[in-house]
Regions:
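Glycine-enriched loop-and-adjacent helix/strand subsegments that border the catalytic/binding cleft
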Residues: 20
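Short, acidic (Asp/Glu-rich) active-site segment that either coordinates a divalent metal cofactor
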Residues: 156, 169-218, 222
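Short helix/loop capping segments that flank catalytic or ligand/cofactor-binding pockets
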Residues: 57, 71-72, 192-194, 242, ...
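Glycine-rich phosphate/pyrophosphate-binding loop regions near the starts of catalytic domains
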Residues: 28-188
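Short, glycine-/Ser/Thr-/acidic-enriched flexible segments
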Residues: 53-54, 67-68, 162-164, 188-190, ...
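Hydrophobic face of alpha-helices
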Residues: 23, 121-124, 195
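Glycine-/charge-enriched secondary-structure boundary and capping motifs
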Residues: 2-12, 28, 119-137, 150-157, ...
């Protein structure tokens, strides 16, 4: 079928033929995420997915949505767009596994000043890679041109996921008690939170060349370190949940330790963490030094090298860590549960 073209719409700043070209370029990446549960292909009004609940007594759907924030500015300055989609997927799927759910489908939304097909395809390439890492299918998406509202070379990216969990297996912290062990799963870097402060620390908007600098203690340029994709923890964490009773999971995002760890704690329980036990990457030390940021603000803003924490009974800790290591996670004991409230960094 011949594709339509509107000269009037193009004159207004929206090139629908660029949209067609984007879809053609991204098809190869989307195909990597397709499974036998996916019905139909790209181009429908909705993404169809056949839900297989075999083995579940009472399936419950869980949804999550998020974006990448101003990490996008780093991608734009470096003109590297093929990993930022991984971040988008990670921010969504890492949230839903905190309830014990398996992500099933993902959808993305890209708003841009001008649809440049090659750039859009690179973004979706990253989204598809994130879906492969998470074991979910990219069943739909939207790319919207916003001429006159956004500069031509800028874009925003957000995503949405739906997962499923058996109601009896929804994560429950009711058995959490003092003595339980908190396990850390290392991050790949800053992940996708705190970039407004990062940009201020290094004055990136006014001095983008700083992204090419390799600071003392770091083994790569600042820009490369900042753009490292958010780690996706779905498969290793679900593997642990299959064999060990996990009492709590926190995805360490905006708000750092102080805001996110308490979200999985039982009332009357606190997380006691020795600062000396936190394996802090050099990037965070550089950020703290360059910005003159207090230790409290660092732990209250950034993940400090810990992207996710799990809480288990002490007798299950070694087994949980072994499973995580078998799935490529360099997990370690971060702290313990004590009586109290919130997070105690000692």
């Amino acid at each position: 079928m011949e594709k339509s073209y509107s000269a009037s719409y193009a004159a207004a700043g929206v090139d629908i033929t660029a949209g067609y070209r984007s879809v053609e370029l991204m098809k190869q990446y989307v195909a990597r995420t397709m499974t036998e549960n996916c019905i139909g292909g790209l181009g429908g009004f909705g993404g169809l997915f056949e839900l297989d609940c075999s083995g579940m007594e009472h399936p419950v759907l869980i949804s999550g949505t998020d974006g990448v924030g101003t990490k996008l500015r780093i991608a734009m300055l470096l003109d590297k767009h093929d990993t930022i989609g991984i971040d988008c997927v990670a921010m969504c799927v890492n949230d839903v596994i905190c309830a014990g759910a398996k992500p099933l489908v993902f959808l993305d939304y890209i708003a841009c000043g001008k649809n440049i097909p090659e750039k859009i395809a690179e973004i979706v390439k990253g989204v598809a890679e994130g879906c492969v890492q998470a074991g979910c299918s990219l069943v739909g998406g939207e790319t919207a041109e916003h001429p006159g509202m956004m500069p031509e070379d800028e874009y925003d990216l957000a995503g949405f996921t739906v997962g499923v969990v058996d109601k009896a297996k929804i994560l429950d912290n009711s058995t959490m008690q003092p003595g339980d062990v908190i396990i850390a799963l290392p991050s790949t870097g800053v992940h996708s939170n705190g970039f407004s402060l990062v940009r201020k620390i290094f004055d990136i908007d006014n001095n983008p060349d700083v992204l090419k600098k390799t600071f003392d203690g770091m083994d790569k340029p600042l820009g490369e370190a900042l753009l490292a994709p958010t780690r996706i923890y779905v498969k290793p964490v679900l593997a642990v949940m299959d064999e060990v009773k996990v009492k709590g999971v926190s995805h360490i995002t905006g708000g750092g330790f102080y805001e996110n760890i308490p979200r999985s704690l039982k009332k009357g329980c606190a997380a006691r963490i020795a600062k000396a036990d936190v394996r802090i990457p050099a990037l965070f030390d550089v950020m703290q030094h360059e910005g003159g940021i207090s230790e409290h603000d660092m732990f209250n803003t950034f993940n400090m090298g810990v992207g996710m924490v799990l809480t288990v009974a002490p007798e299950d800790a070694d087994k949980a860590i072994a499973i995580l290591k078998a799935h490529g996670e360099d997990a370690y004991r971060l702290g313990t549960i004590v009586e109290g409230d919130g997070v105690e960094l000692v």
